[in-house]
């Protein structure tokens, strides 16, 4: 590419004659690039941080739990408390075709876990092996609950990261050790290092997970459960099967079909979709602001070029008159 020295000299002279305008234009271009890069980086960082919070959750999962009834129905008063039970799990599994898997969950807050002279306030959860397909447990040592643990109601447990750090010295292998939870001893069979801050029934890092049947017996919970946790088959959405799930539960517990508050359903699929839409909007806004700032800088550059062209025209005109 051929460089026109005269043109470069004229541009340099014009820039030095209009120092303030030149500096402001240069700053505008710099600021536009900086804002675009900073906004893109900040938006991506925010998105990554939010994704970490939901890390490990199945995107096609749902969670149902009971609330007070909102309407009187078949002799039962409004405001009645009721409970889900194991039979509800079987009803839904057999009668809702779109269900991929469904499993019950129970939990107890404020429990005391003890190992030797160390103590930690933890959350005790009773789960089935299938639950790991809904919320990944990220087992770093040992294993998760299995079918034999459920069938034999074994006194074994999987502990969370904070439970381990509070009860054991760093580097200690917890597998095979016995911890006492609410007065009952359990053998540690696994260590979960799941880090997500958003978790069902409390954070995994602060949990002691027992086989579902073991917790039923230890706390005399009978057949009642707290959550029905499920995923839907590929190609379906939670909203596709949610009405049928609610209908089956309402029929079994004498709840009005029109009662909107008796059953709460957390739709993680809708949450993920909402988050994706939010960050799509943020990305569009970022590009609009960044490109707008760059455009302002480009207009400033074009102004300098225009000033250069005008100055050059006047200069040539004066030279022409002088020659005449």
Positions of the model-derived regions?
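N-terminal Sec/SRP start-transfer signal
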Residues: 1-31
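Short, strongly hydrophobic transmembrane alpha-helices
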Residues: 20-48
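Alpha-helical transmembrane segments of integral membrane proteins
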Residues: 25-35, 283-303
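Peri-transmembrane interface segments
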Residues: 50, 229, 242, 256-290
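Structural beta->alpha junctions
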Residues: 71-82, 114-119, 191-196, 221, ...
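Conserved small/polar residues in nucleotide/adenosyl-binding loops
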Residues: 313-322
């Amino acid at each position: 590419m051929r460089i026109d020295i005269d043109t470069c000299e004229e541009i340099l002279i014009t820039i030095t004659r209009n120092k303030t305008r030149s500096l402001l234009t240069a700053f505008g271009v710099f600021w536009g690039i900086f804002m675009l890069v900073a906004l893109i980086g900040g938006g991506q960082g925010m998105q990554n941080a939010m994704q970490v919070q939901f890390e490990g959750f199945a995107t096609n999962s749902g969670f149902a739990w009971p609330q007070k009834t909102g309407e009187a129905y078949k002799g039962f008063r409004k405001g009645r408390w009721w409970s889900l039970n194991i039979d509800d799990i079987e009803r839904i599994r057999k009668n809702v075709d779109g269900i991929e898997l469904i499993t019950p969950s129970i939990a107890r807050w404020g429990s005391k876990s003890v190992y030797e002279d160390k103590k930690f306030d933890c959350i005790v959860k009773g789960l089935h092996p299938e639950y790991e397909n809904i919320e990944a447990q990220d087992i770093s040592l040992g294993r998760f609950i299995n079918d034999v643990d459920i069938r034999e109601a074994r006194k074994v447990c999987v502990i969370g990261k904070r439970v381990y750090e509070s009860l054991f010295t760093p580097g200690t292998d917890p597998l095979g050790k016995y911890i006492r939870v609410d007065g009952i001893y359990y053998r540690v069979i696994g260590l979960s290092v799941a880090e997500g801050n958003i978790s069902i029934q409390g954070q995994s890092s602060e949990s002691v997970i027992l086989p579902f049947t073991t917790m039923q017996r230890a706390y005399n919970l009978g057949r009642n459960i707290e959550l029905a946790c499920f995923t839907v088959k590929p190609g379906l959405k939670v909203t596709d099967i949610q009405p049928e799930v609610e209908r089956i539960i309402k029929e079994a517990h004498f709840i009005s079909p029109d009662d909107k508050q008796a059953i709460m359903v957390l739709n993680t699929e809708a949450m993920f979709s909402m988050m994706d839409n939010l960050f799509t909007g943020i990305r569009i806004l970022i590009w609009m602001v960044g490109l707008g700032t760059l455009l302002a800088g480009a207009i400033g550059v074009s102004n300098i070029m225009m000033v250069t062209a005008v100055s050059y025209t006047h200069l040539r005109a004066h030279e022409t008159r002088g020659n005449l």
